[in-house]
From Swiss-Prot:
This is Small ribosomal subunit protein uS17. Keywords: Ribonucleoprotein, Ribosomal protein, RNA-binding, rRNA-binding. InterPro entries: NA-bd_OB-fold, Ribosomal_uS17, Ribosomal_uS17_bact/chlr, Ribosomal_uS17_CS. Belongs to the universal ribosomal protein uS17 family. It comes from Citrobacter koseri (strain ATCC BAA-895 / CDC 4225-83 / SGSC4696). Part of the 30S ribosomal subunit. One of its GO terms (molecular function) is structural constituent of ribosome. One of the primary rRNA binding proteins, it binds specifically to the 5'-end of 16S ribosomal RNA. CDD domains: Ribosomal_uS17. It holds the Pfam family Ribosomal_S17. One of its GO terms (cellular component) is cytosolic small ribosomal subunit. Gene3D superfamilies: Nucleic acid-binding proteins. The gene is rpsQ.
Length: 84
C-alpha cells in the first residue's frame, strides 16, 4: 500500500497568528442538476514554522499529522510573493 502525501496550492488569506496561516484553496465543482461549473473555496489552517508568509502570497502546502485541533497541513514553499 502506497501513501501519497497530498499537496495543494492556494492563496494566503490571513497571517495574523503566530506560526500559522490560513490558506484559501479554490476548486471548480459541477452543479448536479444544471451542469454549470461553480467556484468553491476551502480554507485550511497551515503551519508556518518561520513566519515567512504574508497575506496574498501563493503557497504550496502538504498534508501532515494533526498539529492541533484545526491544523493538519504544513507549508512547503512560497510560490509567489504578493505585490503590495
Amino acid at each position: 500500500m502506497t501513501d501519497k502525501i497530498r499537496t495543494l496550492q492556494g492563496r494566503v488569506v490571513s497571517d495574523k497568528m503566530e506560526k500559522s496561516i490560513v490558506v484559501a484553496i479554490e476548486r471548480f465543482v459541477k452543479h448536479p442538476i444544471y451542469g454549470k461549473f461553480i467556484k468553491r473555496t476551502t480554507k485550511l489552517h497551515v503551519h508556518d514554522e518561520n513566519n515567512e508568509c504574508g497575506t496574498g502570497d501563493v503557497v504550496e502546502i502538504r498534508e501532515c499529522r494533526p498539529l492541533s485541533k484545526t491544523k493538519s497541513w504544513t507549508l512547503v514553499r512560497v510560490v509567489e510573493k504578493a505585490v503590495l
